[in-house]
A protein has these predicted regions:
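Gly/Ser/Thr/Pro-rich low-complexity, intrinsically disordered segments
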Residues: 1-186
Length: 186
């Protein structure tokens, strides 16, 4: 599934494999993947920090949408500068988010068209996302694909056939945009 905003749209921190693309920003929503594969979502400096590693990777984007089971007040007071907007300045647009349950065991990917931040937060609280962060926005960038094998070759299938049908196989090749992948353990 898709990553977050480009560096030019917030300069949010990112690190993978020990290589820091941008330093972490205090107070921003962060997804961290531990060296053991454990996933955590929280606020950098409060829930997560450099001393909490070792991390295989971490990525920041905007502020937390839900924090400790409650909707962040910024969801209702934030502007396009906080949460992003379409090229036309619309704050109701395709949006995606990643949430995690209170026990850090279940990840939730939430996405859809015509979402305001309050609507996205409502969807995340409906699935009991204890902590959650905004990922990318706008139709071209909100994307989730499941990969299956047919005749020995990987085939990508979009989560939502309408709206996620552009460049369906984008996660099967090199990309200038960041993304996450989840693999089942054997």
């Amino acid at each position: 599934f898709n990553g977050g905003f480009m560096a030019t749209h917030g300069a949010y921190g990112a690190m993978s494999g020990g290589i820091e693309a941008l330093p972490a920003k205090e107070g921003y929503a962060t997804i961290a993947i531990g060296a053991d594969g454990a996933v955590r979502i929280g606020e950098w400096g409060t829930d997560l920090n450099a001393d909490g590693g070792p991390y295989a990777a971490w990525r920041q984007n905007a502020r937390l949408i839900t924090q400790n089971g409650a909707v962040n007040e910024r969801v209702y007071t934030g502007t396009a500068a906080t949460w992003g907007s379409s090229i036309n300045g619309d704050v109701v647009t395709w949006r995606s988010a990643l949430g995690i349950d209170e026990n850090n065991e279940v990840l939730y990917f939430v996405a859809g068209p015509s979402l305001s931040m309050p609507a996205l937060a409502e969807a995340l609280t409906a699935v009991s996302a204890h902590n959650s962060l905004l990922l990318d926005i706008n139709e071209s960038w909100v994307h989730f694909a499941a990969i299956r094998y047919a005749d020995g070759a990987p085939v990508a299938e979009p989560l939502l056939p309408e709206g996620m049908d552009t460049t369906v196989d984008r996660y099967l090749r090199q990309s200038s945009r960041d993304f996450f992948y989840v693999m089942a353990q054997e």
